[in-house]
């Protein structure tokens, strides 16, 4: 899959974050990213099919454990993130501006370990 350059991004191949397969758990309303980390996750559109989140994680900030259903994240800038999973394992991930990433619906905490604020759009699938 290729991202088409329509908003000033260089086309970038998509990726699937390779999270630990035993790290996830079903999402509950108690671990909704918007409720757990309202300073970082804002709903910008919601309908029967999707919920779109504007994500801004300040440099050095860390979210509590939360979940997303199956989702696509689009990076609006270069990012270095540390994901921690319920099983205690963690993974550092470098993402590039314009990169689209498939998230297969699991729980995690995220820490911005980069040199600037993280800005992304997350499209959560409801169906």
Mark where each language-model region is.
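A short glycine-rich, His/Asp/Glu-containing loop-to-beta-strand
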Residues: 37-64, 69-73, 122-123
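Histidine-centered metal-chelating micro-motifs
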Residues: 60-63, 100-111
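Glycine- and acidic-residue-biased ligand/ion/polar-headgroup-sensing regions
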Residues: 68-87
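Ligand-binding loop in jelly-roll beta-barrel domains
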Residues: 78, 105-126
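Short acidic-glycine-tyrosine-enriched beta hairpin
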Residues: 89-104
């Amino acid at each position: 899959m290729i991202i088409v350059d329509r908003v000033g991004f260089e086309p970038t191949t998509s990726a699937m974050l390779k999270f630990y397969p035993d790290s996830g758990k079903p999402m509950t309303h108690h671990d909704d990213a918007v409720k757990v980390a309202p300073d970082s996750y804002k709903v910008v559109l919601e309908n029967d099919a999707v919920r779109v989140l504007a994500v801004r994680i300040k440099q050095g900030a860390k979210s509590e454990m939360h979940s997303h259903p199956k989702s696509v994240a689009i990076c609006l800038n270069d990012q270095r993130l540390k994901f921690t999973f319920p099983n205690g394992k963690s993974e550092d991930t470098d993402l590039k501006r314009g990169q689209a990433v498939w998230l297969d619906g699991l729980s995690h905490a995220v820490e911005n370990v980069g040199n600037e604020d993280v800005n992304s759009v997350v499209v959560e699938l409801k169906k």
